[in-house]
């Protein structure tokens, strides 16, 4: 175990500075198209929405981040394509949109047919899970800019205007249904890599909680895609949705100005216990960085909560309160 408390900011990712950069980038984005293609939401939600007649088109863009560096270490790239799809699709699902098409962007230091084939394998698998088509993309060879590779993509979805879910219906007393993650997913990997480095571990060594796999393989488990959320939307009165990704539970603030009280949270998986122990990371930093076992959240009336939990393999984890974000007695914000 590392003697000092490792943090995301110390590893090089300062969320507050990142938010400042985003604000500086978007402050001047004032032009808005009218008619078909007019924006229906402001910048800052999980996905952007534009007018398309009876429907709203939804767009999200995201990448795999520094998880690709672990794929390089393991020389196994057939799962990061799933991650790329998942990060975008889950953001569309978080506003109630169904994914319909995808384009990818792959930036390379150098060409390799085996590498490219594995990337494509993951993208195809992710698209199949998401029931959508990959309709194009861009591959750029940038040896002076890229060390290794970077993978990102943009996803297009659609939803009837009256069925958009952006959190306005969330009310005091609404119930929180959490859906489990299957690992770290695709956020917080700068801190993950720092923990592995500082604790003296190797990605190729056995994972202490399951010696049938390695640390690297455990960290490369692809991000879960939550397509079952669309079925819940059809059968339940869903008031709000959240994809638990970067900044952990902090991103819940974009859903509603009300608070979240997680009285019975999903138990974090062994990979989170390992990272916390080896990195000497405190509870607050863990919940502000990682999904901590819960990859998606559904907010809905108590009458529909059990049904939603049953449909997704999730559980009731808490309720909407007046303010704050709490996990048991831990104040997140």
UniProtKB/Swiss-Prot annotation:
Q: Name one GO cellular component term.
A: cytosol
In what pathway does it function? Answer: Purine metabolism; IMP biosynthesis via de novo pathway; 5-amino-1-(5-phospho-D-ribosyl)imidazole from N(2)-formyl-N(1)-(5-phospho-D-ribosyl)glycinamide: step 2/2
Q: What Gene3D superfamilies does its record include?
A: PurM-like C-terminal domain, PurM-like, N-terminal domain
Can the keyword ATP-binding be found in this entry's annotation? yes
Q: Name one GO biological process term.
A: 'de novo' IMP biosynthetic process
Per UniProt, which keywords does this protein have?
A: ATP-binding, Cytoplasm, Ligase, Nucleotide-binding, Purine biosynthesis
Give the catalysed reaction(s), semicolon-separated: 2-formamido-N(1)-(5-O-phospho-beta-D-ribosyl)acetamidine + ATP = 5-amino-1-(5-phospho-beta-D-ribosyl)imidazole + ADP + phosphate + H(+)
What Gene Ontology molecular function terms does this protein carry? Answer: ATP binding; phosphoribosylamine-glycine ligase activity; phosphoribosylformylglycinamidine cyclo-ligase activity
Q: Where in the cell is the protein located?
A: Cytoplasm
Main location, first listed in the record: cytoplasm
Q: Give, as one word, the top-level EC class.
A: ligase
Q: Which InterPro entries match?
A: PurM-like_C_dom, PurM-like_C_sf, PurM-like_N, PurM-like_N_sf, PurM_cligase
Short name of one Pfam family for this protein? AIRS_C
Taxonomically, which superkingdom? Archaea
User: Under which EC number(s) is this enzyme classified?
Assistant: 6.3.3.1
The entry's family comment says: Belongs to the AIR synthase family.
Q: Which PANTHER family match?
A: TRIFUNCTIONAL PURINE BIOSYNTHETIC PROTEIN ADENOSINE-3 (PTHR10520:SF12), TRIFUNCTIONAL PURINE BIOSYNTHETIC PROTEIN ADENOSINE-3-RELATED (PTHR10520)
Record's protein name: Phosphoribosylformylglycinamidine cyclo-ligase
Q: Which organism is it from?
A: Methanococcoides burtonii (strain DSM 6242 / NBRC 107633 / OCM 468 / ACE-M)
Q: Which gene encodes it?
A: purM
């Amino acid at each position: 175990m590392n003697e000092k408390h490792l943090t995301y900011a110390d590893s090089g990712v300062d969320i507050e500075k990142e938010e400042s950069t985003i604000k500086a980038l978007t402050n001047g984005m004032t032009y808005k198209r009218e008619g078909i293609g007019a924006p229906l939401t402001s910048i800052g939600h999980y996905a952007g929405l534009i007018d398309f007649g009876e429907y709203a088109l939804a767009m999200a863009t995201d990448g795999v981040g520094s998880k690709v560096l672990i794929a390089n270490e393991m020389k196994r790239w057939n799962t990061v394509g799933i991650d790329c799809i998942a990060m975008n699709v889950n953001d569309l699902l978080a506003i109630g949109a169904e994914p319909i098409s995808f384009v990818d962007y792959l930036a390379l230091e150098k060409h390799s047919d085996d590498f490219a084939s594995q990337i494509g394998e993951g993208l195809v698998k992710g698209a199949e899970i998401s029931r959508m088509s990959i309709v194009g993309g861009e591959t750029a060879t940038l040896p002076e800019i890229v060390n290794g590779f970077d993978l990102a993509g943009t996803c297009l979805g659609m939803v009837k205007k009256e069925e958009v879910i952006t959190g306005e219906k969330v009310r005091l007393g609404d119930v929180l249904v959490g859906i489990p993650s299957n690992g770290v997913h695709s956020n917080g990997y700068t801190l993950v890599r720092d923990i592995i480095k500082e604790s003296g571990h190797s990605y190729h060594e056995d994972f202490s909680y399951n010696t049938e796999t390695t640390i690297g393989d455990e960290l490369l488990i692809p991000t879960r895609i939550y397509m079952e959320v669309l079925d819940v939307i059809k059968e339940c009165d869903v008031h709000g949705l959240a994809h638990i990704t970067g900044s952990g539970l902090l991103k819940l603030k974009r859903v509603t100005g009300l608070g979240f009280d997680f009285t019975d949270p999903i138990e974090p998986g062994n990979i989170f216990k390992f990272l916390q122990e080896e990195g000497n990371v405190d509870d607050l930093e863990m919940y502000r960085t990682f999904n901590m076992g819960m990859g998606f959240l559904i907010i809905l009336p108590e009458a529909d909560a059990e049904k939603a939990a049953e449909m997704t393999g999730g559980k009731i984890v808490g309720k909407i309160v007046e303010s704050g974000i709490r996990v048991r007695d831990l104040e997140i914000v």
